[in-house]
């Protein structure tokens, strides 16, 4: 019997999302206009809370859909205007270009990145050294590339290796289903569980590595570019200004990586079983024999393009997104990718998040029009200049760990810049606050998958169910990093940021906003 029209419409609304989630969103959409008529300020804060809720529930439904519905309603009922949304999007065009073109550009360098991580995995036998190598490699790559893409590459390596061993363990060849363990011998199952633990720890080290490297440069995370633009900093300025906080945090983060592996705390310390290593090594040897001269040329070309990418970013030869576009053109032209559909695949990872970021800017427009953050900013600005840095760092860290750090960073840097333009704080203080905001959004946000887009990408990937990586397990494994990164970042903001910045300014290393 066919279902009713109403039931069909209910099933279509937000698709596979739970009924309680659909009902919650409908309640939000119904009550918002009435609350806005009664009290616009409360309605604005309610909208922000609802939007954060959609981010926190990202595993139930991709936030673009519910967040987009809330944003459309906000424009319709007058919480902001379409013109203001357009202004916010135009002001952040560089960030949208970064997400569209840089992520797509790195897609065409995946072969090189896969080659690098495969070599690391098979050539280093010590688990502690291997974990450190993955963390450092992810940090370095994320400082110049997009963290999401770096994690995507590591996921590709892990899924590939897991599939190779799973096929051998199940003896089912190409027809093997990686989610089905029913055909695996009990002995192989024990080895497989150990292999899963090994991959889980490597993925978490790599994920945290993207946060350690991503906070250091203006292209490491989308919000970094927003903050750099607001402060008028280029690549070198941004790196130097962040370094009093980010360099000590990087060192302590790497020490944490070694400690948890050595002590086998928080689910770390599992080694690669020898039986698995033998299978993977055999497969890699076969792959290397099959590699043609044309394949080798592709790797060399991608490495040269990587040098161009780093050089262009460091010397600020063009806007970041345009450098990404140049990578797409060079990588496709010189490696023989000419089919439109093959090129189109490169954009599938970035465009949903680009659309979500545009919705962020709609919510930011509401926050500005309704003056939602004015009381918080006034409270922070009433404190001493030294205390302001700590408060901005803590407020950003708390919100970023439950919400999305791009959203939080955008709001706070806009408010800090407005305070400077109104004469509430000096230029020097604004530049220090920009560092506190950037580090506050990037470091504590490793606490949950909600805060870091790369973590959320890992949690929702095809790899997570294979290696039994759940939301709770991710939070638990991230806990030592969360504690160390947050506390060291706070201490550096408190004690080293101002004196180190003053020293670099006097030495003539730093440019200031004019």
Swiss-Prot record:
Keywords: Antiport, Cell inner membrane, Cell membrane, Ion transport, Membrane, Sodium, Sodium transport, Transmembrane, Transmembrane helix, Transport
TM region positions: 23-43, 63-83, 97-117, 120-140, 144-164, 202-222, 238-258, 303-323, 357-377, 391-411, 447-467, 475-495
Membrane-related topology note: Multi-pass membrane protein
Subcellular location(s) of the protein: Cell inner membrane
GO CC entries: plasma membrane
Primary localization class, coarse: membrane
Catalysis performed (reactions): 2 Na(+)(in) + 3 H(+)(out) = 2 Na(+)(out) + 3 H(+)(in)
GO MF annotation: an example: sodium:proton antiporter activity
Function recorded in the entry: Na(+)/H(+) antiporter that extrudes sodium in exchange for external protons.
Family: Belongs to the NhaB Na(+)/H(+) (TC 2.A.34) antiporter family.
The protein's name in its UniProt record: Na(+)/H(+) antiporter NhaB
Species per Swiss-Prot/TrEMBL record: Salmonella paratyphi B (strain ATCC BAA-1250 / SPB7)
């Amino acid at each position: 019997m066919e279902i009713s029209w109403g039931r069909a419409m209910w099933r279509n609304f937000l698709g596979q999302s739970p009924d309680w989630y659909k009902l919650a969103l409908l309640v939000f959409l119904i009550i918002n206009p009435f609350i806005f008529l009664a009290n616009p300020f409360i309605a604005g804060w309610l909208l922000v809370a609802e939007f954060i809720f959609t981010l926190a529930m990202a595993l139930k439904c991709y936030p673009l859909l519910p967040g987009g519905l809330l944003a459309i309603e906000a424009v319709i009922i007058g919480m902001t205007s379409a013109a203001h949304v357009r202004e916010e999007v135009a002001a952040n065009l560089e960030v949208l270009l970064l997400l569209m073109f840089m992520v797509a550009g790195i897609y065409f360098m995946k072969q090189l990145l896969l080659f690098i991580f495969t070599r690391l995995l098979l050539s280093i036998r010590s688990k502690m050294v291997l974990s450190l190598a993955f963390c450092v490699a992810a940090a370095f790559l994320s400082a110049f590339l997009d963290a999401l893409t770096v994690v995507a590459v590591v996921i590709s390596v892990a899924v590939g290796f897991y599939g190779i061993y799973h096929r051998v363990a199940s003896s089912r060849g190409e027809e093997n289903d990686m989610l089905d363990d029913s055909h695996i011998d009990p002995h192989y199952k024990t080895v497989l569980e150990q292999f899963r633990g090994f991959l889980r720890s490597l993925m978490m080290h790599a994920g945290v590595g993207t946060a350690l490297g991503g906070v250091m440069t203006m292209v490491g995370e989308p919000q970094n570019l927003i903050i750099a633009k607001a402060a008028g900093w280029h690549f070198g300025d941004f790196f130097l200004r962040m370094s009093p906080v980010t360099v000590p945090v990087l060192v302590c983060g790497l020490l944490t990586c070694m400690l948890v592996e050595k002590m086998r705390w928080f689910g770390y310390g599992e080694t690669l079983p020898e039986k698995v290593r033998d299978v993977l090594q055999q497969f890699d040897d076969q792959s290397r024999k099959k590699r043609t001269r044309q394949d080798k040329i592709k790797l060399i070309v991608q490495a040269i393009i990587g040098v161009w990418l780093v050089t262009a970013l460091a010397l600020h030869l063009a806007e970041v997104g345009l450098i990404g576009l140049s990578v797409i053109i060079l990588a496709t032209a010189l490696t023989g990718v000419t089919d439109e559909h093959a090129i189109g695949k490169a954009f599938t990872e970035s465009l949903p998040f680009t659309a979500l970021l545009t919705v962020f800017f709609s919510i930011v427009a509401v926050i500005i029009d309704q003056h939602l953050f004015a009381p918080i900013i006034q409270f922070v600005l009433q404190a001493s200049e030294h205390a302001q840095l700590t408060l901005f760092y803590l407020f950003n860290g708390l919100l970023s760990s439950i919400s999305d750090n791009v959203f939080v960073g955008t709001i706070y840097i806009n408010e800090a810049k407005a305070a400077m333009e109104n004469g509430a704080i000096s230029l020097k203080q604004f530049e220090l606050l920009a560092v506190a905001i950037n580090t506050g959004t990037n470091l504590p946000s490793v606490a949950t998958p909600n805060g870091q887009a790369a973590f959320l990408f890992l949690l929702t990937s095809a790899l997570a169910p294979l290696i039994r990586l759940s939301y709770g397990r991710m939070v638990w494994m991230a806990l030592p990093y969360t504690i160390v990164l947050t506390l060291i970042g706070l201490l550096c903001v408190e004690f080293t940021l101002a004196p180190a910045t003053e020293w670099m300014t006097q030495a003539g290393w730093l440019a200031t906003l004019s």
